[in-house]
Amino acid sequence: MNAKGESMLSRRLEALTPYVPGEQPRDRKYLKLNTNENPWPPSPRIEALLREYDPDQLRLYPDPWSLSLRQKIARKYSVDVDNIFVGNGSDEILSFVWYAFFDGLYGKLVFPQFTYSFYPVYCDFYEIPYRRIPLRPDFTLDLEAMIENGGEPSCGMAFPNPNAPTGIALTLKQIEDLLNRYPTDRVVVIDEAYIDFGGESAVGLIDRYANLLVARTFSKSFSLAGLRLGYALGSPELIRALFVTKDSFNSYTVGRLTQTIGEIAIEDEAWFAEKIARIIEARDFFSEELKGQGWQVLPSKANFVFVRKPGLTGQTIYETLKERGILVRYFNVEGIRDFVRVTIGKREDMARLLEELKRLF
């Protein structure tokens, strides 16, 4: 309030409900299985880089086009550099996407009812109307309902694959069928933050569907959540629009050191493949053991599982485990309150959690 008792905040800000991130506690040491961080350190090549990096480079502005990093990403996916955009984490990229492609003048944005909870925040921020489409009883996406949108036009569609927080993935055929039926003048955004843990990527479809944009991140599979680096793949038209959006906010979004670390990370394919395989093995081990203890475990292609046990609330599970020094994610949302989301750590982490769950519940 100012001296006259008037609010100094915009009406837009006063109407916002911000995203609530997962806990990053400092009060004690926890086994952190709540924010889908990779349990392994990044590629050792990155440690070597940091030891040798010349800090004098940091007095210079970074390449605003991130050309070298984009070239390396393009080579990895066998696409052109004009198909690649990079930003400070996929969250920033998704914010640009919402601004660049979704306009309430053409209808509501469509996304699943239970999904990444930043989506409605972006909609409120940019004043984009939206429709949440309920999941099917088995927690899979109802693609038919997403396409139909209640018989109304939509300004676009967005969903994670695998979905979060369920971990359930669509097949490539399902995605192709959706794209074949959806209006070609409306952008479809597939958020592939967790695709490397067993899902089928839609990146190979961007040359056939000019309205498809795929968002990826270095946070999960590359163990670089603390770096804040993401990228998107799509048609040159979509990528140009993202650059226009970025340059209207901040031309120099991705720092020099961040770009260099990204280049090194994406080239260490041996490290990447080994760590992904170990996480998948730990996930499958944990899932089967937990089912044996009477838990429902949704089929996951991510680095987490969404689970519940009959007779228990998600809040009870979360609070009891926290007292024991283990953090999982609980969503106080109607329809999924009995579930918790468990990040997959190292196999020994999951074995410890299994023992605690068996003893406590």
Curated annotation (Swiss-Prot):
Domain of life: Bacteria
Known catalytic reactions: L-histidinol phosphate + 2-oxoglutarate = 3-(imidazol-4-yl)-2-oxopropyl phosphate + L-glutamate
Keywords attached to this entry: Amino-acid biosynthesis, Aminotransferase, Histidine biosynthesis, Pyridoxal phosphate, Transferase
Single annotated GO MF: pyridoxal phosphate binding
SUPFAM superfamilies referenced in this protein's UniProt entry, alphabetically: PLP-dependent transferases (SSF53383)
Pathway membership, UniProt: Amino-acid biosynthesis; L-histidine biosynthesis; L-histidine from 5-phospho-alpha-D-ribose 1-diphosphate: step 7/9
CDD domains xref list: AAT_like (cd00609)
Record-listed N6-(pyridoxal phosphate)lysine modification sites: K220
Cofactor(s) this protein cannot do without: pyridoxal 5'-phosphate
Keyword GTP-binding among record annotations: no
Database matches in InterPro entries: Aminotrans_II_pyridoxalP_BS, Aminotransferase_I/II_large, HisP_aminotrans, HistidinolP_aminotransfase, PyrdxlP-dep_Trfase, PyrdxlP-dep_Trfase_major, PyrdxlP-dep_Trfase_small
The protein's Enzyme Commission number: 2.6.1.9
Any single GO BP term: L-histidine biosynthetic process
Coiled coil segments of this chain: none
UniProt-listed Pfam families: Aminotran_1_2 (PF00155)
UniProt similarity note: Belongs to the class-II pyridoxal-phosphate-dependent aminotransferase family. Histidinol-phosphate aminotransferase subfamily.
Subunit structure: Homodimer.
Protein name: Histidinol-phosphate aminotransferase
Biological source species: Syntrophus aciditrophicus (strain SB)
